[in-house]
C-alpha cells in the first residue's frame, strides 16, 4: 500500500541530507505525500510558501528568522526586575521550554529548523554546516539539571550589563537563524528598532524571505 506521511517530528527532515532526499524521492516515486509543515513555525505556512515560490520560478537568496518561541519569550522577559535565570525558570514553568531548558538554550532545535528551511530553499545543508554560536558557556550543558539550575544565576550579572547596554542603544535581543546562500548560522543578535525582528512579541516566530523577486522588500511571515 502507498500511504502518505505527515511528520510532526523534525528529525527526519533535518537528519542526514541523503536520508532526507531519499524520503522525498520515495514519496515522489510512490505518488504519495511527505509533509512536515509544522516542523518549522508551528502552524505558520513557511515551508509551503518557500515551495510555492520555488515552484513559480523564484529563487530563495536569504532567510532570516526567529524560530524558537521559547528563546524569544526568554529574551522578551528579561528586564531590570527579571534576570536571565528567572526568565528561563518562567519559560519552563509556563511550558514554553522543554523540561530540561538546556535543550532550548543549546540552539539545536533552531539549527534543525534552519536546516529544513535551507533544504526546502534548494541548498544541500547538514546540521554540522551551521555555525552555531552559544550565548552561555559550554559547561552549562554538562552535568545534571539540578547543577544547571544552581549555576544559572551566575550569568545574571553579565546578562544585566549587556541588557543595559542594549537599552542605551535602543536595541533588543533576538536569537536569529540566518541562511545567506550556502552559509547558515544561528546566533544571539542585537537588533535595532528599524529591523523587522525588533517588535516580535512573546513567543512569536518570524521569517523574512529574500528572493529574486522579493529582493528589496523581503516577504515576511509572522505569528504563532
Short names for language-model regions:
Residues 10-37, 42-53:
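Rossmann-fold NAD(P)-binding glycine/threonine-rich loop
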Residues 1-7:
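Rossmann-fold NAD(P) dinucleotide-binding segment
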Residues 77-78, 86-198:
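Substrate-binding/catalytic subdomain of NAD(P)-dependent oxidoreductase enzymes
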Residues 62-64, 72-75, 90, 175-224:
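Catalytic, metal-anchored helix/loop core of enzyme active sites in primary metabolism
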Amino acid at each position: 500500500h502507498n500511504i502518505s506521511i505527515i511528520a510532526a517530528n523534525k528529525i527526519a527532515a533535518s537528519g542526514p541530507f541523503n536520508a532526507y532526499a531519499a524520503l522525498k524521492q520515495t514519496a515522489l516515486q510512490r505518488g504519495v505525500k511527505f509533509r512536515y509543515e509544522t516542523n518549522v513555525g508551528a502552524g505558520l505556512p513557511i515551508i509551503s510558501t518557500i515551495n510555492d515560490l520555488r515552484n513559480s520560478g523564484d529563487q530563495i537568496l536569504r532567510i532570516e528568522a526567529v524560530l524558537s518561541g521559547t528563546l524569544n519569550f526568554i529574551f522578551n522577559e528579561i528586564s531590570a526586575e527579571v534576570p536571565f535565570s528567572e526568565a528561563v525558570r518562567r519559560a519552563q514553568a509556563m511550558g514554553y521550554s522543554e523540561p530540561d531548558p538546556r535543550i532550548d538554550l543549546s540552539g539545536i532545535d533552531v539549527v534543525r529548523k534552519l536546516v529544513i528551511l535551507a533544504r526546502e530553499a534548494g541548498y544541500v545543508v547538514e546540521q554540522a554546516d551551521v555555525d552555531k554560536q552559544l550565548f552561555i558557556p559550554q559547561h552549562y550543558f554538562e552535568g545534571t539539571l539540578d547543577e544547571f539550575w544552581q549555576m544559572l544565576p551566575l550569568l545574571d550579572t553579565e546578562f544585566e550589563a549587556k541588557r543595559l547596554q542594549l537599552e542605551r542603544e535602543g536595541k533588543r535581543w533576538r536569537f536569529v537563524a540566518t541562511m545567506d546562500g550556502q552559509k547558515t548560522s544561528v546566533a544571539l543578535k542585537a537588533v535595532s528598532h528599524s529591523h523587522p525582528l525588533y517588535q516580535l512579541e512573546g513567543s512569536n516566530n518570524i521569517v523574512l524571505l529574500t528572493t529574486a523577486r522579493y529582493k528589496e522588500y523581503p516577504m515576511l511571515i509572522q505569528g504563532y
